[in-house]
Amino acid sequence: MISRHFTVLTALNLQTKIKICIRNFSIRGAMTKVNGNSNGNGISASTDLLDTPSAYTQKSNKTHTSIDLRSDTVTVPSVEMRRAMAEAIVGDDVYGEDTTTNRLEQRCAELFGKEAGLFVTSGTMGNLLAIMAHCQRGEEIIVGRYNHIHRWEQGNYAQFAGISATTLEVKPDGTMDLNDIEQAIRVKDCHMPASKLICIENTHNYTGGKALPIEWMRSVKQLAERRDLKVHMDGARIYNAAVASNCSVSKIASFADTVQMCFSKGLGAPVGSIVVGPKDFIDRARHSRKALGGGWRQSGILAAAAHIALDHADATIRADHERAKTLARMINDATPEEFRTKVFAAEKDITNMVLVHCQNGVTVQQLTDFFQKHDILAMTFDARRIRMVLNWNVSDENLETIVEVYKKFLKQL
C-alpha cells in the first residue's frame, strides 16, 4: 500500500516538474523571441508576449479635448446620424417588423453580393453566429493565431458552441500559408473533429490593418471549394480593404461564403455589425442570435445610424487612409537619424492604422505615457508596437499636434 502511494506521489511530482520545465522553456522561448529583430512592416514572434497587459481593457484619462487614436471604435455619432436615429421608423425586430433594420439588412446583402443579411450587436457576436451557422458541435475551424476571432474573442466558439480550432501562423501581410491551410484540413477519421470552416480577416488588425491580397483570397476560396469547406471573412474593416485594394466591397466579399462587417469601426456608427451570406445560413444565424441574447426590439434606432455611415463610407475611409499615411510619414520625418533604430512608424501598405515600433532602449510604455500626459491617447498594441488608428474625429490639425508632442518626447530621451 505504501509502495503504491509512493509510486503515485513520484508520478505526480514528475508530472509537476515536467509542467514547470515546459513553462520555464516557454518563458525562455518568449524572452528569446522578444530579443529578436522585427522587420518593421508586420508582425513577428518577437512582438507576441502573452503577459503584455491588454490595451483593450486599459482605461485612460480621456477628456473632451483628447486626441483619441486608440481605435476607430471611439468615434461619436455625427449630427446627421443623431437626427436619423431620432427620426427612425421602428418596430419589433424579433417579429421582423422594424422596417429600418429590414432595409439595412437588404441593403447590405445587395452591397456585398449575398442573399441575405442579419443586423447584430457587435462584430464578436457576428463572427460567433457565423461559426455556429457553419459548424456543428464537435467540428473545427481553421484560423490564424493572430486573427481577432481567435486572439480577442475569448475563444467563444469553444465556450458557447463546442467548436474547436486549428490555429496557423500569420504572415506579415495577414495571410496564412496555403500549404499550411491544406495540411490543417482533417482527414475523415473517428478520432478527429471534422474541418468545416476557414476563417480569414480583412483588413488584418494585428498586422497593422493590412488588406489581404486578392489573389491569395481567391486561392483560399478555391482550396475551400475543392476540399468541401466554407470560408468566413471577419470583414470588420472590409471597407478599408476595398479602398486599399481599389475595388468594390462586393469583390472582396466574393472570396468568402459569409462576411461580417462592423458599422462601429471606421464607418463611425455607434453600435452594430452586419452578417451576410446565403438565406439558409442567415436563418440559422438569426435563430442562434436569440439564444445569445441578441434578439433586439426597436433596433432601427441604431440601424438608422448605420445607414448614414454607409452613405458616407467611401469618403470617410479614404480620408482616414490619407491621414494615416501622412501621420506615419510625419513621424519618420521628425525622427532624427540617431533615433531611427529606436523609434519608427511602419509606412508599408498602410490603411487606417499607424504602428510605431519602439526598441533598443525605448519602450512603448514610455511613449504612450508621454502622449497621455499631453492629452493624446494611443494603444499599447504589444511589447514593441503602439497602434494609432485614424478615425473621423481626428483632423489634419490634430496630426500637427501629435507630431509636435512626439518631437518633445524624443528631446527628453
From Swiss-Prot:
GO terms for biological process: glycine biosynthetic process; threonine catabolic process. Pfam families: Beta_elim_lyase (PF01212). It comes from the Eukaryota. InterPro entries: ArAA_b-elim_lyase/Thr_aldolase, Low_specificity_L-TA-like, PyrdxlP-dep_Trfase, PyrdxlP-dep_Trfase_major, PyrdxlP-dep_Trfase_small. GO terms for cellular component: cytosol. Its cofactor is pyridoxal 5'-phosphate. The modification N6-(pyridoxal phosphate)lysine is found at K265. Keywords: Lyase, Pyridoxal phosphate. NCBIfam families: GntG_guanitoxin, PRK10534.1. This is Uncharacterized protein R102.4.
